[in-house]
């Protein structure tokens, strides 16, 4: 079962991190993608909060297409360009590959930034200049724009369907074969 926790968009990264720590009091290690998602959720200036919803909703719909009626009740999200771009998942019954938010963030990040460490994405979304070790607003803006483009490529119906066809063409018949944690 996928749990969805809705956080107020006005929370800053420290407050979001504190919430994660409290929820995670049983000691489960947080992944870098958890930190990326919390960073995005806290950012309303550059649309990170909306991108976080795209990631959440896409991954949720990929597993459970009947979640769509609930998603469209989010009127803020419904007004964005992304709502129509992921609507196709409401009718998708393919279950050989159901990406989670780690998959989606990693692919979008590698595609747009030619980097693989999600900890670098957290730094870039914070505006870190890796050469000068300073934090710059233009890096934040550029990073959110690049991430947005990577997410758009990931959620594109044609691209996603082609990827699923490639998986099937490679001989995979079950999602269990794709998971390294069989």
Q: Would you name each region that the model predicts?
A:
Residues 1-103, 107, 115, 165:
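Basic- and aromatic-enriched surface patches that contact anionic nucleotides/nucleic acids
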Residues 80-182:
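A cross-family structural signal marking well-folded subdomains
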């Amino acid at each position: 079962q996928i749990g969805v926790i809705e956080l107020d968009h006005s929370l800053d990264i420290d407050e979001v991190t504190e919430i994660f720590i409290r929820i995670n009091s049983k000691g489960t290690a947080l992944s870098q993608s958890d930190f990326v998602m919390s960073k995005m959720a806290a950012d309303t200036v550059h649309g990170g909060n909306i991108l976080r919803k795209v990631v959440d909703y896409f991954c949720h719909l990929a597993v459970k297409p009947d979640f769509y009626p609930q998603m469209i009740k989010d009127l803020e999200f419904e007004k964005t360009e992304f709502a129509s771009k992921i609507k196709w998942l409401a009718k998708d019954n393919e279950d050989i590959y159901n990406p989670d938010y780690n998959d989606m963030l990693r692919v979008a990040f590698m595609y747009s930034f030619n980097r693989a460490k999600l900890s670098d994405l957290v730094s870039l979304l914070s505006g870190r200049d890796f050469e000068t070790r300073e934090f710059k607003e233009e890096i934040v803006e550029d990073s959110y724009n690049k991430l947005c483009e990577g997410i758009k490529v990931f959620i594109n119906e044609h691209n996603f369907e082609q990827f699923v066809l490639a998986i099937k063409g490679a001989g995979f018949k079950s999602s269990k074969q794709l998971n390294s944690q069989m």
